């Protein structure tokens, strides 16, 4: 019998083992769709980004006008720009749900995959931040000023670091140029990290909703999960296109319709919605260095998840007490997101401080304590 080229060709064999004949647990739910959705988000962002980069000018005098030119004069430029801006929001929605799935079902016990995933999240956050500066509107400029200025809280080398990042003594043309270079470069780093992420995942195989070994019940990835992923793509593109066509500025900030002006500070400087939870944690501590440390810890705390796992069961499926705690954590993050969008005044200050404390306390203490308690009850 003639050898199947899909299984014998060196390149096709890799694709086959990753996307076609990959043995997958038979019971993985829709929560396992977000990996492929993140892949399609990344491809969409790179394609729309490349098209935008061909018309964009990374110069403080021309950046704002060039974005306006893209939307007015370039064929379907308005659509490409709207897809790129709102695609970033969907990227973050998918990655947050993907991380939430990992926390709920204990996927973080695949330590290598989990750690690369967190590095991916940090790279994505960096990419989104430098990208937000490029239109050179008011919120772009002041967001860049405020966030990069946080580096000055680092003892001894802080001020030098800020001036090095800015390329001068304030956010200006050198800053915009290097941010454009970084925004162009980082997505390709995300692609390579994603390949490493998948390599580690395929070493162990996927987890499943029951959190049990599924070696005895695997099915091929194609056609079952390729079809399921296609449905996921459709369900994601529908709201993305609805947003891009009908409500393109719904998630944006009105301040960004005003060209950057170093002499006028907007009344409320705030980042895009997907950073608001971390911004609320930053603002909840009335000390600059403390705030920066809390901001960093709010994401880096995810590295501790495998170390803090105290339960004898992997998933939360059969652990109602931990489930309640998990949903309280989600509610807490939503409160932080809301607080991040509010001005710094009572009662928002105290709500933010309580929510920030609860966030760290839940992850560091309540989850391990509850898991130990459940072990006592169940075993």
Curated annotation (Swiss-Prot):
Membrane topology note: Multi-pass membrane protein
Protein residues bound to a ubiquinone: 202
Residue ranges of the TM segments: 34-54, 78-99, 114-134, 179-199, 227-247, 289-309, 321-341, 348-368
Keywords, sorted A to Z: Electron transport, Heme, Iron, Membrane, Metal-binding, Mitochondrion, Mitochondrion inner membrane, Respiratory chain, Transmembrane, Transmembrane helix, Transport, Ubiquinone
Localization of this protein: Mitochondrion inner membrane
UniProt-listed PROSITE patterns: CYTB_CTER, CYTB_NTER
Known function: Component of the ubiquinol-cytochrome c reductase complex (complex III or cytochrome b-c1 complex) that is part of the mitochondrial respiratory chain. The b-c1 complex mediates electron transfer from ubiquinol to cytochrome c. Contributes to the generation of a proton gradient across the mitochondrial membrane that is then used for ATP synthesis.
Family: Belongs to the cytochrome b family.
Protein name, entry field: Cytochrome b
Annotated organism of origin: Tinamus major
């Amino acid at each position: 019998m003639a050898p199947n080229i899909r299984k014998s060709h060196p390149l096709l064999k890799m694709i086959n083992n990753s996307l076609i004949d990959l043995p997958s647990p038979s019971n993985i739910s829709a929560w396992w769709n977000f990996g492929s959705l993140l892949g399609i988000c990344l491809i969409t962002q790179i394609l729309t980004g490349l098209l935008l980069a061909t018309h964009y000018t990374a110069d403080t005098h021309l950046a704002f006008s060039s974005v306006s030119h893209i939307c007015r004069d370039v064929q379907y430029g308005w659509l490409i720009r709207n897809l790129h801006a709102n695609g970033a929001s969907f990227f973050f929605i998918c990655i947050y749900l993907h991380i939430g799935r990992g926390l709920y079902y204990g996927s973080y016990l695949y330590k290598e995959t989990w750690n690369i995933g967190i590095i991916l999240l940090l790279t994505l956050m960096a990419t989104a931040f430098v990208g937000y500066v490029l239109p050179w509107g008011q919120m772009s400029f002041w967001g860049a000023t405020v966030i990069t200025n946080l580096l000055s809280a680092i003892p001894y080398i802080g001020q030098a670091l800020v001036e090095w990042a800015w390329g001068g003594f304030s956010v200006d043309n050198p800053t915009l140029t290097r941010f454009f270079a970084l925004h162009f470069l980082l997505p390709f780093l995300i692609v390579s990290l994603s390949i490493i992420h998948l390599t580690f995942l395929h070493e162990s195989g996927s987890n499943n909703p029951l959190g049990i070994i599924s070696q005895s019940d695997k099915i091929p990835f194609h056609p079952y999960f390729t079809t399921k992923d296609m449905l996921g793509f459709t369900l994601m593109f529908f709201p993305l296109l609805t947003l891009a066509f009908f409500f393109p500025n719904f998630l944006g900030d009105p301040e960004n319709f005003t060209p950057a002006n170093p002499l006028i500070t907007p009344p409320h400087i705030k980042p895009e919605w997907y950073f608001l939870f971390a911004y609320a944690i930053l603002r909840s501590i009335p000390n600059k260095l403390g705030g920066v440390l809390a901001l960093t810890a709010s994401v880096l705390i995810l590295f501790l998840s495998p170390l803090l796992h105290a339960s004898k069961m992997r998933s939360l499926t059969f652990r109602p007490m931990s489930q309640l705690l998990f949903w309280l954590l989600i509610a807490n993050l939503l409160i932080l997101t809301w607080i991040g969008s509010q001005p710094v005044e009572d009662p928002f200050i105290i709500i933010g401080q309580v929510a920030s404390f609860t966030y760290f306390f839940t992850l560091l203490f309540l989850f391990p304590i509850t898991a130990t308690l459940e072990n006592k009850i169940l075993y």
